[in-house]
């Protein structure tokens, strides 16, 4: 993943402005990095699939811990992986969205 230029967003808003932010991510030419909770990771991937279906997504799960893991693909591919592997839906997530 090229991270020569990226924007760090912190945690995304819960409701107000969330869809607007996904539209901004879709129109960006730089990588976007943000945190996501275990309770919202699937909804976030669904929104990314809607707004950025061809972008590359990397989910960094449990960074700096024993079970650190990186999952990458399109939003649909990552969503399918997490739906198939329910135990992977837990933990702390860093999400990187990269335009193609």
Regions found by a protein language model. Name each.
Residues 30-31, 35-100:
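A contiguous loop/helix-start segment that scaffolds small-molecule binding in enzyme catalytic cores
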Residues 1-28:
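Class I SAM-dependent methyltransferase SAM-binding "motif I" and its flanking Rossmann-like core
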